[in-house]
Amino acid sequence: MANALLMQTSSKPMPGLQSWPQLCRLQSVIERRFAFSRSLVGRALDTFGAQWADEFETLLSSLFEDEAALETAMKGYSAFAMDSMRHQRAFEKTREYPNKTYAEAAQAVYFNEAHMLREYLPGLLLSHFLWPHHYRQLQFFDMAFAAPLARAADKRFAEVGVGTGVYARRLLSCMPQAHGLGYDISPSSCQFATQHLAAAGVSGRFAMRLQDIVAQPMEPVPWLVCVEVLEHLEDPVAFLRVLRQAVAPSGKAFITAALNAAHADHIYLYRNAQEVWQHLDAAGFHVEQSFVAAAYAPSAPGVPVPLAAAFVVS
């Protein structure tokens, strides 16, 4: 993990970065305080080009008004990435996640306000643009889910496990007719996502609910998003069956899972995308499209690396 998500040690020239003032400010903060990540921005710009830069610039501009705010966010990202790296190194040795219950993970992470607002959520937010497999998943989301939603007459959607609000923002920003509901069990996630969507100017079309949809089922919707929730659960299939009931007849869902990705709150270990597919099938979903991306190349043959797996299902 160190060689791709955090410990970049060589700085590459970034011609044209001056076209994006916030990215320039972010790079300045990184060079000054977080030199181990100095090539993240340049590498992503080289890989994904102007579209990535435009999108990241828009997000940064709406949420972080000055370098001090960017530095605070980058501090959260650094802590998030370092913690992830430590867990991944341990996983590479044991090939298992530490044994923990959902209640233990929830208490340590989701209901830990200081950790969520200072590290976890800012780190996760920036990772959508600084980690290649996270951004590639956003691209797949745009193509395989957002595009058909944009053509649909009924643009109502729900997101279960809203987290930072990145995916909801993506839909609301590109579709003025879209309206959404967000569900999360973490008060901090609800707060962060609400503030994020307000800063983006789209909160008027999105209602956030602090609600466990297993204990209190949600109303079915034609379009449903659930990003990286399954690995946080003890019984993903039971949760997927609840999600299946939340998708209206003829509706579609975008469901993802993190594979071989050790984090403090990851409980269920998916080793490959086929295991997720089997769980989706067991819950009654039909897989229409799928996508898998690796975080980085393995350090040696057979060493597991984090993967992002996404599915469009009906």
Summary of predicted features, one role per range:
Residues 164-176:
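Conserved SAM-binding loop of SAM-dependent methyltransferases across substrates and taxa
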Residues 153-163:
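Conserved class I S-adenosyl-L-methionine
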Residues 23-110:
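N-terminal auxiliary segments of SAM/dcSAM-dependent transferases
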Residues 251-258:
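Conserved beta-strand signature within the Rossmann-like core of class I S-adenosyl-L-methionine
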Residues 179-184:
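Conserved SAM-binding motif I beta-strand of class I
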Residues 214-224:
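A short acidic, Gly/Pro-enriched loop at the edge of an enzyme's catalytic core
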Residues 186-188:
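Conserved SAM/SAH-binding beta-strand->alpha-helix loop
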Residues 238-249:
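A short glycine-rich, Lys/Arg-flanked "PGG" loop and its adjoining helix->strand segment in the class I
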